[in-house]
Amino acid sequence: MEGKNIKNIIFDLGGVILNIDYNKTASAFKKIGGNKFDKLYSQFRQNNLFDNLEIGNIESSSFIHELKSALHLSGSDSQIINAWNAMLLDLPKERLELLKSVDKHYQIFLLSNTNKIHYDAYMAYFKTTYQLDFNSLFNKAYYSHEIGLRKPNNDCFEFVLKSHSLNSTE
């Protein structure tokens, strides 16, 4: 895997490192009465409520309140959180080992479109499953809800490159 000019690798989280299934969240919302959830959110599109959550413009509690209102849900906040997190599956041990081996030859970074609710869930999963701090696998991990930027916008990638004086050709 070692390349002559490659010094840095920027990984994505969802669907690359962490297995995800968007349909599980849609199904979970349907079970609690959110039959129109897929009109608001899917793997390929989402409305502004989700965009704002991903770039940290709204708090998790506001997101939950607004989502309940949009879907006319009366369930508890924990039901909403569980449905929202249903898409988060597992992180296979082989991927963890791959990250550890790649780290020996390259600087590795993480750049993920995510939100605080999901972040808390997979951090807890990783700590419980592997007894490790997930972020320790990377030279630096960047999350959209923390940096206020989302992929595929160029400014998101530029932020990471500039933060570490990285050359995009490396």
Predicted regions, residues:
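Surface-exposed alpha-helical segments enriched in charged/polar residues
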Residues: 97-100, 162
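Substrate-recognition "cap/lid" segment bordering the active-site pocket of phosphatases
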Residues: 116-170
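A structure-centric signal for secondary-structure junctions around beta-strands
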Residues: 5-6, 105, 138, 168
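Short beta-strand/turn micro-motifs composed of small residues
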Residues: 112
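Short, structurally constrained coil/turn elements
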Residues: 102-104, 134
